Amino acid sequence: MLTDVQLQRYGRQLLLHDFDIAGQEALQAATVLIVGLGGLGSPAAIYLAAAGVGRMILADGDVVESSNLQRQISHTEADIGLNKATSAAATVAAINSDVQVETITHTLTEDELSERLQGVDLVVDASDNYPIRFALNRACIASGIPLVSAAAVRTEGQLAVFYPAAGGPCYRCLYPQAGDDTALSCSESGVLAPVVGVLGSLQALEAIKCLANFGEPLIGRLLVMDFRTVEVQRLVLARRSDCPDCQHLSRPQIT
């Protein structure tokens, strides 16, 4: 049950005609795992904390470097040398002390994901390599929870919610084979800071929609954006009958 202080704090989003107290309480009861606290994970964590998600698990094995500060807004100059999950956790706690924050300060392995996802309601994939993306996809399928995935490089980005348990495709339906990890790497290809800011914020939005049963999440849809021209495409994603990860599921396909 929300307190008077919380009702005041979240009042602006509670004014929305289709976002009610039940939705806010669902956020408060939710646990979200964010993998990667860089350019995407930073704004996602900040906005989910501000929106009132009750418990967040922040996972990143990297440390903050000066080159990160151009776009990774959960870190400051004072955080250089700190683990990114630790740094982001301090930022989240400063924004909303009601949020229970836990950290994983090493790179997650697939073997430990099934245990780590116990009690988790949703995963935000803000990682930058195919092996962990594939591992998160398999783990979310096994746990029956949504995976909010985004990628950004240069001035381009994409966003989708992969949720086979709700009838949608999975990440491997879109990417059956691993590509070149350098294509996902800002350090190799460059990126403009607002690009990851927008994509990470949209990840938070999609997470809120899934958790609070609000609006229409991007399940079975892929949002593709070119920020150089501000061109946006919304593509339909189909489940692959030969998908190596979700072909065993018999859920109806979203149309």
Regions found by a protein language model. Name each.
Residues 1-255:
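Adenine nucleotide-associated cytosolic modules
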